[in-house]
Amino acid sequence: MKAAVKVKNLTKSFGKEKVLKGISHTFEAGKIHGIMGFNGSGKTVMFKCICGFLQPDRGSVYVYGKRIGKDIDFPENTGMIIESPGFLPYISGYENLKRLAQLNRKIGDTEIRDAIARVGLDPFSKKKVGQYSLGMRERLGIAQAIMERPKLLILDEPFNGLDKRGAQNVCELFVELKEKGTTILLAAHNVMEMEWLCDTVCEMDAGQLEVVYEK
């Protein structure tokens, strides 16, 4: 089993509140891993530690064998949605992605347009983001996460604001990405409804992570 992400004894507190309580888990490469749990259960904090945005109090995080905070500061070739993307409302969806792509020389116009098309926003790419619905902004965030064609995707609540059809289309996109070798970690309140999508489902509860489903 090749590990995409490995966390060892991951512990994080804020003041007297211990949010992560010594989590150890391996997320296998090339699979879709669902993490469910209520608000405040620790899902987002774990994702931020994996992405290098938060430093754990104890423990370690490895992404494809490289230790975060020691070998590298942030995971390489990784697309992520950890918080609501801060898109500029007065320019179009395409212009927002083009602006963000300037930070990465690997992303050109072809990658931007392909990402927009894959999330079903092609007809709205010239529309100002301020006129987007919540679901459209969520899909634009997913387009941002995939436009580098990443090896790893980390997505916190990627189905927020999506209607049933939109969620289905996004799920189909995730399956397509997995088939091409992308590892996906996604958090939601209840991913048990998507057993068909996820290869494994873990539950985060009171700072502990437990596997509840595995194909």
Regions found by a protein language model. Name each.
Residues 36-38:
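The feature captures the beta-strand-to-loop junction immediately N-terminal to the Walker
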Residues 153-156:
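Catalytic Walker B motif of ABC-type/P-loop ATPase nucleotide-binding domains
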Residues 188-189:
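H-loop/switch region of ABC-family ATPase nucleotide-binding domains
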